[in-house]
A protein has these predicted regions:
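Conserved active-site neighborhood of the chymotrypsin/trypsin-like protease fold
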Residues: 79-162, 194, 218, 340-342
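C-terminal recognition in membrane/secretory proteostasis and scaffolding
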Residues: 23-29, 38, 53-55, 64, ...
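Active-site region of chymotrypsin-like
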Residues: 46-50, 126-137, 163-219, 232, ...
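A conserved glycine-rich beta-strand in the N-terminal activation segment of trypsin-fold
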Residues: 31-37, 57-80, 86, 105-108, ...
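Short, conserved beta-turn/loop elements at beta-strand boundaries and strand-helix junctions
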Residues: 55, 114-118, 170-177, 255-257, ...
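A short, Trp-centered hydrophobic/proline-enriched beta-strand micro-motif
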Residues: 43-60
């Protein structure tokens, strides 16, 4: 199967980006003309262009932020005097403005809710009088059907005025939006290009979803977040914070293979999905390896782990979790050792990971002499993606950045601590190879549990020497004089124009007596 690369459909108006973020934009075929009668009255007035200045984190220079970039996308007016857009349009925004079609002025906005895992965000305007003349767009209460006609509204690159393209719904699937979050996704053949992100998709005068991505290696393939996902998001953030989508933390496999069925001694009438090993599973879960999940709620699960969603639509059974979860549990019917059982399986909002993402935050760091320490995050390890040489090297030495990428944290290892920047030039590390990207195993033979724990170990050390072991094969150890490292830190900060030795969370630990 051809693997498709997706672009986040926003306009990157910066003059240049870091080299590994550059992409070649292919020419898009002209969009199909839209008949005037297809445009709902006043809808154009409620689709806005979003301008944002982004200051993303720099995981390799964690004491600073990345250079600002100017981007633009789209948004749509919804109830409650709010603008709905995509998280990737306004994530890490230091400034946001919106502008309505044909308007001469921009209106300042504030990001009040973000769900990066499902790519949704809400804006509030500083001047809410805007909404007196810009009405909310009505949302459809049901999914569109495959082959339904849709219109994509937005402000794609190539012009300043509102663009409307026409297409049909070609596919509806339940797919992964991020590493640990899945949701419904609508595929359309309407042109959805950079800048369309956050614009509404309209069918029969109502919004059926929000544009968020397109395929870079194919023409006229776009993706829409359907209203069901939007409604879940809006309900979640009604209390002022985003908790995340409920998910069943269990790995399963299909039940198609006849030998597997014979091994499980299943009657031909039994269909479902088989529970794999439960190492990542909630200890409170009633599920065991080799259980066969046959139903979720009242929905039968077939041998490909799918449930029916209408006459001509099947999706992964996990889709029902977001509908059926109550009080942190979801009802399942299972077959175990030939017996049918009804169980309540726990659900959670995503998995906790040893290497998490920053989720909209900035990295914590601590500078000790010429060495910068930080937590390993998905953003930090992103340089391995697409870099076969680095990935092979890290795999060969057994770096936890590769070998433990999907692991959960534990009491012994809450997170991975890395040397997040090349050593600052200094005689204290003269003769050592640069340990950028190396994971800390121990300080003076004490295993490091977390970044906070490591800072406490350095603070409380009494020995003349500090011995740093790294978690890999063949990596040299580091031995430095404790007092010299402490004494040199201030001048190293000054020489490199760094204001703070560490982030507040870690300096509070370092300065604690």
């Amino acid at each position: 199967m051809t693997r498709m690369r997706f672009f986040a459909a926003l306009t990157l108006a910066a003059s240049s980006l870091i080299s590994n973020a550059q992409e070649t934009v292919k020419e898009v075929a002209p969009a199909a003309p839209v008949p005037a009668q297809a445009i709902p009255a006043n809808l154009e007035n409620s689709v806005v262009k979003v301008f944002a200045t982004l200051r993303r984190p720099d995981p390799y220079r964690p004491w600073s932020k990345a250079a600002p970039i100017e981007v633009s996308g789209s948004g749509v007016v919804i109830e409650g005097n709010r603008i709905l857009t995509n998280a990737h349009v306004v994530g890490y925004a230091s400034q946001v403005e919106i502008q309505a079609s044909q308007a001469g002025d921009k209106v300042s906005a504030t990001v009040v809710a973000v769900a990066r895992d499902i790519d949704l965000a809400i804006l509030k305007l500083d001047d809410e009088s805007f909404f007196k003349t810009h009405a909310p767009v009505k949302r459809a209460s049901v999914l569109p059907k495959v082959r339904d006609q849709v219109f994509a509204y937005g402000y794609p690159t190539g012009g300043n005025s509102l663009s409307i393209t026409k297409g049909i719904v070609s596919r509806i699937e339940f797919v992964g939006y991020s590493l640990d979050t899945s949701g419904l996704r609508i595929q359309v053949d309407a042109a959805i290009n950079q800048g369309n992100s956050g614009g509404p998709a309209i069918a029969e005068d109502k919004m059926v979803g929000l544009a968020f991505a397109g395929a870079t290696n194919a023409q006229n393939i776009g993706y829409i977040i359907p209203n069901e996902e939007i409604e879940l998001f809006l309900r979640d953030v009604a209390d002022g914070k985003y908790d995340g989508k409920p998910a069943l933390v269990v790995e399963t496999q299909t039940l198609e293979n006849p030998v597997l069925r014979a091994f499980l001694k299943l009657d031909k009438s039994v269909e479902g999905t088989v529970v794999q090993g439960t190492s990542q599973q909630d200890p409170a879960s009633p599920l065991k390896e080799w259980d066969v999940i046959t139903r979720i709620g009242n929905s039968p699960i077939d041998n490909q782990a799918m449930v029916k969603l209408g006459d001509n639509l099947r999706v992964r059974f996990h889709y029902r979790v977001q509908q059926l979860a109550r009080n942190g549990k979801v009802p399942l019917t299972i077959v175990r050792d030939g017996k049918t059982l009804e169980v309540q399986a726990p659900v959670s909002a995503g998995r906790k990971l040893l290497i998490p993402d920053l989720n909209g935050g900035y990295p914590s760091y601590f500078i000790y002499g010429p060495i910068v320490f930080s937590r390993a995050t998905a953003e930090f390890t992103s340089y391995l993606a697409g870099n076969a040489g680095a990935l092979n090297a890290y795999s060969y030495i057994g770096s936890p950045l590769v070998t433990r990428r999907g692991d959960a944290p534990s009491a012994e290892r809450e997170e991975l601590v890395v040397v997040s920047s090349p050593f600052f030039p200094h005689k204290l590390v003269s003769g050592y190879s640069n340990r950028f990207g190396a994971v800390i195993a121990s300080i003076n033979e004490v295993p490091v549990r977390s970044l906070a724990h490591m800072v406490a170990l350095l603070r409380d050390a009494k020995d003349e020497m500090i011995v740093i072991h790294f978690d890999q094969r063949g990596g040299e150890n580091l031995v430095v004089r404790r007092k010299e490292m402490v004494d040199a830190t201030e001048s190293i900060l000054t020489d490199n124009g760094i204001r703070m030795q560490g982030t507040k969370d870690l300096m509070d630990i370092w300065n604690k007596k």
